[in-house]
Amino acid sequence: YYHNKVVRIDNVDFILSTLWSKIPSVDEFAIQNGMNDYAQILYNKRRLIPQNINDEFERNLAFIKQSVMESDADKIVVVTHHLPTFAALDERHKGSVLNTAYATELGNYIADSRITAWIYGHSHHRTDLMIGNTHLVSNPLGYVFCGENTNFDDSAVIGV
């Protein structure tokens, strides 16, 4: 598992980070009380709180931006767990108070960047979209026991 690492393969830089989401203070209570993560995960030996997530988000985003800026590769692929835009959320979740636990709106940054592709997960929903010249794609299996993602494509290939 790589976190905040860059791996170069054939002049393509893969920038790998969790990219925790940015949780606005207005959403903190609902997210902390509405998601199991906050009851189950310890952060520095204490219960996880939204501020921990926001601190990690700032570190992750700074790493991604610095790595993109420093890259001299022909192509750049960013790989994150969390979604880099609300546009990638499943329609059934649009407007949910929990959305900022899954995604952060980086659309303007992505559109202005030289990132070739951005691969992400966490949503348990297959997506394929473009922001500027960047191809954003997710093909998660989701929770198998409940048949969550019937759109999963086990033969999917992402070309860069």
Q: What positions do the PLM features span?
A:
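A substrate-binding/cap region within the structured catalytic cores of diverse enzymes
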Residues: 3-9, 19
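Short His-Asn-centered micro-motif
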Residues: 4, 120-121
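Binuclear metal-dependent phosphoesterase catalytic core
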Residues: 7-8, 90, 97-116, 124-160
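Divalent metal-coordination and catalytic microenvironments
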Residues: 14, 81, 122, 136
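Active-site-proximal loop/helix segment associated with metal-binding centers of metalloenzymes
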Residues: 15-77, 84-93
